[in-house]
Amino acid sequence: VLPLPQIIAALKIGAAIPQRALALTFDGGHISVYHEAWPRLKALGFAFTVFIATDFIDAGSQNYMSWDQLRELASSGVTIGTLGATYGHLVSLKEAKAAADIARANHRFMDEIGSIPELFAYPFGEYSANLQAIVARHGHSAAFGHHSGVIYRGADYLALPRFPLVGGYSNLARFRTVVDTLPLPVADLVPADPFLSNNPPALGFSIVGEMGPLDNLACYLARFGKLNLEQLGPSRIEVRFPEALPIGRNRVNCTLPGPGGRWRWFGLQLLVH
């Protein structure tokens, strides 16, 4: 278990990372992170990141950590990231309002923590090309969604995946699968903007590197199950949806058997409005 900024920095310069290295993240700043998660992880020497919506902290609710508690975490080596101020649907806001939300949060972090977080997490995992650009302009070097997958050096650092471990996915079997998973690197992803203008979208990507035969590549969407794939040439994959995607968040997961019984995984979220 490594600090998330350390993993990002190593990937960007091509430095070695241990096999099965992982980072732990929590969204929202709930008080249970302070009282339950932090003592256990500290005893194990495990680093983690907590993403904060500053309005929730400023409201003073007993359900969320206080600024004093966040300063205590930060001084102990916990990474503090940002969700913006309101934890609202930023992707649906006009550009100026989304930018103002992120900027207001950064001002609060400067006031209370003394620095602007390097890492951003999109509320509800929702992002668009425009929102990615806004996040970058406000000084955040990496941003995370809620789609599943393994990060790798050539990934889009403003659209990084995370494996959720909540609800029905919060069990040891799921955790073991996640830890064993390998990246499925892709390039030339279409559509470039996950905030869809056409529905159903023409989804396609190119597999990067030597992954062996792609006959066993499979992509899934919860609403439709296993999706039809068409391979164009040695590495280009086109995904065919049987009908328009429903309004809201649609997560596509693509897997390919890898070495040693492990799985390669690429995920993305498509947003219909």
Predicted regions and their residues:
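Terminal accessory/targeting
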Residues: 1-21, 32-35, 39-48, 52-65, ...
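A structural signal for short, well-ordered beta-strand segments and their strand-loop junctions
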Residues: 1-3, 121, 143-145
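Metal-dependent polysaccharide deacetylase catalytic core of the NodB/CE4 family, i.e.
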Residues: 8-22, 30-131, 141, 154-164
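Acidic, His- and aromatic-enriched active-site or binding-groove loops in soluble protein domains
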Residues: 26, 140-149
